[in-house]
A protein has these predicted regions:
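Adenosine-phosphate binding glycine-rich loop
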Residues: 175-243
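Short, acidic/turn-prone active-site loops that include or flank metal/cofactor-
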Residues: 44, 111-114, 131-135, 153, ...
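Short glycine/serine/threonine-rich phosphate/pyrophosphate-binding segments
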Residues: 92-95, 155-160, 180-183, 265
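ADP-ribose/adenylate-binding Rossmann-like module
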Residues: 107-109, 146-153, 162-187
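Short amphipathic alpha-helix with an adjacent loop that forms part of the alpha/beta core around
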Residues: 133-143
Length: 336
């Protein structure tokens, strides 16, 4: 189950899962792709997910979710964000530089060969020359992708937007005056794209911080990207936990499914204890982590344990500011 999740995460950069936490189907888990639920257990429980697809597909946060009388833990995994800059002009250079500083894999594409050189973009991971009509052929689809359209005209803008809106993405922004943006929108509406699709485009691009210099515009653009990137609560991948999964370790996966107060790790944080007692990852250290490690060998199948950090209980568990943490224990007899 987790190996499949991490495999698809490596390919797409983003995965959404949901687990049932109560009732007769407790422990059943699915992956949500293209608004459809795909069972990660067996085909016998595939049908039950159809009743929940709409609500699960709409959920954008890692969190607990009630649908009717059924409780779910929805988890959004993200990894390796890609910044794809379409247009190699003067604004693109500082955008690429800042994007690299922020931890993005950076791609720059332009239809002019002399505009996409290593001298102009020393921080880029990938440089592509070609027509903007070739985006689908030259740039693989990737869900955790942030597209910045900064071409020199509305024809280039519409060529880029036309292809990007037919693929998954996390962010799509387009530079230009309001008139240029209006022309592009009208052209795309005439081609059959809907207002709903076009409203996903950040245009004009960037936060309204003022400034006309290329570097100032780049700060505006990347600030909006960071804002969008941090808009939802997601689960960031612990490399040690992923390594244990890939090595098919048997043991217990522990995940924070809810928290309040001052607990140091957020919802979705994971750690894994293998059968030999070796720990991978962390859910925040201290006595909470110690108590979870102590309980893990006794866990049976799918189990939730609540650690009360309020008042004296919090002091005993190393969280004197109070709060509460719920930890999900999943017994992994053979990681698959």
């Amino acid at each position: 189950m987790y190996r499949k999740i991490y495999q698809i995460l490596e390919e797409t950069g983003k995965v959404k899962t949901a687990m049932i936490l109560n009732g007769i189907h407790k422990g059943a888990k699915c992956m949500i792709r293209e608004n459809q639920c795909i069972s990660l257990n067996d085909s016998e429980v595939q049908e039950l997910w159809k009743d929940y697809e709409k609500e699960l597909a709409a959920c954008q946060d890692t969190k607990l979710l009630w649908i009717g009388e059924t409780e779910f833990f929805v988890e959004i995994y993200v990894k390796n964000p890609q910044l794809i800059i379409l247009g190699g002009g003067h604004v693109s250079q500082p955008v690429a530089k800042i994007g690299k500083m922020l931890g993005f894999h950076v791609t720059v594409m332009d239809d002019r060969e002399d505009f996409v050189t290593a001298e102009r973009f020393p921080d880029a991971d990938r440089l592509i020359t070609g027509s903007y009509d070739e985006i689908s052929e030259k740039i693989p689809a990737y869900e955790n992708a942030y597209y910045v359209i900064v071409t020199r005209g509305h024809l280039g803008d519409s060529a880029c937007a036309r292809q990007i809106m037919r693929r998954p993405y996390t962010y799509l922004g387009m530079i230009g005056s309001r008139n240029k943006v209006k022309l592009t929108r009208e052209k795309l509406l005439g081609e059959g794209f809907t207002e709903e699709q076009l409203n996903t485009i950040h245009a004009p691009i960037g936060l309204p911080i003022g400034g006309n210099m290329p570097a100032e515009i780049a700060v505006s653009i990347t600030a909006e990207i960071v804002q969008e990137k941090n808009r939802y609560s997601v689960s960031y991948i612990d490399e040690a936990v992923e390594r244990a999964v890939r090595e098919k370790k048997e043991g217990v996966m522990m995940t924070i499914i809810s928290k309040s107060g001052s607990s140091p790790r957020g919802t979705g944080s994971k750690m894994f204890l293998d059968k030999k007692g070796k720990l991978y990852g962390s859910i925040g250290g201290g006595n909470v982590e110690f108590q979870a490690m102590k309980h893990a060998p006794e866990a049976t199948d799918t189990e939730i344990v609540k650690y009360n950090l309020s008042n004296a209980g919090g002091a005993n568990l190393g969280m004197i500011c109070g709060g509460q943490v719920e930890v999900l224990f999943e017994v992994m007899k053979e990681l698959s």
